[in-house]
């Protein structure tokens, strides 16, 4: 007689992870526009708990190059496709379509991300760069943050995208080094991700870089501290901490729900290490709105200072 092995039950979600249903006038307006323009946002795809808050504040995250990724990270709910078989072709007019649509939405801060496209010769770097340039051309005042793949560590592809002049260049380390092989796709390496952020800083030391760490996957405090140290060593300016939540039964289970107090502790530690800004909380995600408000203030201040310096230089010349 065979034994029946019972499945381990999921750890129940604590009260601090419960959120209200999305609502609000700006949320309704943006949702309607997205439907009309047939645009996909990560906010909707990932069922982000901050969607209502971000949309109400004029912020949204858009995903380029389709809805099928060539990677299969065990925490992510985006569809996975086989690069050898081939994925749906990328729409060559997507940069113009996305840029025009964003210009109609009256956003203050936009985040552009993409699936991994290992099936493309340049892994989508030029398509991504064209999108950023087109958005900037249509609305020079809009703050553009990009959240990028690792481009398999190819420095030339990273630099090509950075040369499009996004205001913030984000690439997520996701988890600590020990857990990376079991959490991320085998092609996604911990040191490779650090290399992406380092390449951006080497290309332009003034470009803001950003990364994100999920907690609750079984990491230790010592490992998280080491990850923060590694990020600072490559000049990363901004870091966010959020609780990992299991999307489906097929994905990695939550090992631990981190308390709000512990998230606050990590914020204090990261700030002490010299990060320009830290967003840390159970519901915080890579592009959390609170961080965007902070970055918006810094970027606008720098933009205001640049014309002033140019004017001073002009006066000296004349």
Predicted regions and their residues:
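Short functional micro-motifs and their immediate structural scaffolds
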Residues: 53-56, 74, 78-81
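Glycine/Thr-rich phosphate-binding loops of Rossmann-like dinucleotide-binding domains
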Residues: 72, 120, 179, 249, ...
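Core AdoMet radical
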Residues: 77-97, 102-155, 161-197, 210, ...
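Short cysteine clusters
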Residues: 48, 69, 73-76
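Auxiliary Fe-S-binding modules of radical SAM enzymes
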Residues: 1-61, 65, 97-100, 106, ...
């Amino acid at each position: 007689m065979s034994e029946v092995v019972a499945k381990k039950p999921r750890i129940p979600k604590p009260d601090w992870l419960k959120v209200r249903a999305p609502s609000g006038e700006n949320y309704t307006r943006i949702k309607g526009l997205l439907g009309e323009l047939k645009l996909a946002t990560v906010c909707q795809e990932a069922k982000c708990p901050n969607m209502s808050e971000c949309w109400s504040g004029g912020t949204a995250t858009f995903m380029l190059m389709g809805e099928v990724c060539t990677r299969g990270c065990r925490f992510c709910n985006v569809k996975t496709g086989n690069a050898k078989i081939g994925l749906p072709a990328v729409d060559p007019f997507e940069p113009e379509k996305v840029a025009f649509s964003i210009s109609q939405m009256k956003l203050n801060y936009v985040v552009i991300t993409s699936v991994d496209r290992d099936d493309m010769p340049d892994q989508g770097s030029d398509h991504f760069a064209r999108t950023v340039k087109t958005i900037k051309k249509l609305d020079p005042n809009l703050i553009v943050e990009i959240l990028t793949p690792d481009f398999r560590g190819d420095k030339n592809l990273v630099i090509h995208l950075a040369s499009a002049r996004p205001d913030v260049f984000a690439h997520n380390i996701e988890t600590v080094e020990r857990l990376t092989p079991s959490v991320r796709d085998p092609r996604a390496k911990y040191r490779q991700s650090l290399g992406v952020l380092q390449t951006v800083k080497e290309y332009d030391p003034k470009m803001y870089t950003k990364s994100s760490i999920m907690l609750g996957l079984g990491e230790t405090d010592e490992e998280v501290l080491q990850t923060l140290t590694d990020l600072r060593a490559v000049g990363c300016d901004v870091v966010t901490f959020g609780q990992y939540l299991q999307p489906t039964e097929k994905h990695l289970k939550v090992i631990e729900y981190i308390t709000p107090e512990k998230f606050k502790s990590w914020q204090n530690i990261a700030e002490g290490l010299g990060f320009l800004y830290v967003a840390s909380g159970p519901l915080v995600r890579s592009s959390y709105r609170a961080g965007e408000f902070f970055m918006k203030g810094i970027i606008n201040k720098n933009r205001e200072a640049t014309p002033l310096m140019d004017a001073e230089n002009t006066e000296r010349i004349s």
